[in-house]
Amino acid sequence: MREYKLVVLGSGGVGKSALTVQFVQGIFVEKYDPTIEDSYRKQVEVDCQQCMLEILDTAGTEQFTAMRDLYMKNGQGFALVYSITAQSTFNDLQDLREQILRVKDTEDVPMILVGNKCDLEDERVVGKEQGQNLARQWCNCAFLESSAKSKINVNEIFYDLVRQINRKTPVEKKKPKKKSCLLL
């Protein structure tokens, strides 16, 4: 079974832990202590293939920056999350993406831009078009709006990253060994 190392990044309070826990455990937790770093494992089936996802739920971008290079180096796919209710969380993502590309030393990094808390439409300050435009600027990066609370597009975030990783590094099908018979 193939393993995937996925990293959830973004400013504090955007709902990184809520999205991760909703995906892994199927529950929405209203109150959290700020995350330092949590790791979760979940086996899923994506496109008829069993996958083991290791998801790293990280601290907000403004905290524990020393650890960030390490999990960027080890991660295979990245969810960059902002809250549609806070413009500053959206603005923070450009630097975060640039740091990922610098650490990975490539532009071709499986990544998805996630506008979280789309259930709070009446508190929206970041328009959907802003997210779509930023994703286009980022070499047509994948983009979704989500809600951990309302279970909107939660699974899709992680499944999309798995598909991107598979496109970048396809699973090699094991060829059956040819059996040979030697007659003496």
Swiss-Prot record:
Residues bearing a lipid moiety (S-geranylgeranyl cysteine): C181
Membrane topology, record value: Lipid-anchor
GO biological process entries: cellular response to cAMP; cellular response to nerve growth factor stimulus; cellular response to xenobiotic stimulus; establishment of endothelial barrier; liver regeneration; negative regulation of collagen biosynthetic process; negative regulation of synaptic vesicle exocytosis; nerve growth factor signaling pathway
EC id: 3.6.5.2
Nucleotide-binding is among the record's keywords: yes
Location within or outside the cell: Cell membrane; Cytoplasm; Cytoplasm, Perinuclear region; Cell junction
Positions of modified residues (Cysteine methyl ester): C181
Quaternary context: Found in a complex, at least composed of ITGB1BP1, KRIT1 and RAP1A. Interacts (active GTP-bound form preferentially) with KRIT1 (via C-terminus FERM domain); the interaction does not induce the opening conformation of KRIT1. Found in a complex composed of CDH1, RAP1A and PKP3; PKP3 acts as a scaffold protein within the complex, the complex is required for CDH1 localization to mature desmosome cell junctions. In its GTP-bound form interacts with PLCE1 and RADIL. Interacts with SGSM1, SGSM2 and SGSM3. Interacts (via GTP-bound active form) with RAPGEF2 (via Ras-associating domain).
Family to which this protein belongs: Belongs to the small GTPase superfamily. Ras family.
Protein name: Ras-related protein Rap-1A
